Amino acid sequence: ELKSGDSIAILGNALPDRSQHFGWLETLLTQANAEKDLTFRNLAFSGDEVQTWHRIDNFGTRDEWLAKVKADVIFAFYGYNESFKGYEGIEEFKKNLAKFIDDAKAQNYSGKGAPRIVLFSPIALQKLANPSLPKVEDTNTNLQNYTAAMLDVAKAKGVVMVDLYQPTAKGLPEGSTLDG
């Protein structure tokens, strides 16, 4: 549940990084919570993984930026980049995700207590009729496995998780993505 005055920091990979150009998530949440005066700060970067923060020197750490934006809530979009490590990388991903959650819960970025964390799984790849693009089946199997791993960690750590994989695996309208 979002509270009045919440500052929501968005972390993760290309999905939230690209979404900042469209603003649909922020718009829908603001519209649904118009009386709550929410603030959104998108800190996502396409190359980010749960254990990495790819920025230039002296940019600041993830924790420093979460403190700068006084994060009450963290929307964490992870699992896509990590999924390229295949089945062999799942246990390391679960360990890194659990550590991220524990580390974030130990912080007080906003001065109002530990942040509330919402995990978002990767979306499924869209099958496009472009022979230049790779087949999506193997990648989607990995994405499904990483989504399941995220669900396990979310349950174990008592955080909310939004499964974006399942509804998108059923198919997206043509043109929903630029590259599948």
PLM region descriptions:
Residues 1-4:
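N-terminal pre-domain segments of enzymes
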Residues 6-21, 46-51:
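Catalytic nucleophile-elbow at a beta strand-turn-alpha helix junction centered on a G-D-S/GDSL motif
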Residues 23-41, 48-180:
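Alpha-helical cap/lid subdomain in secreted, periplasmic
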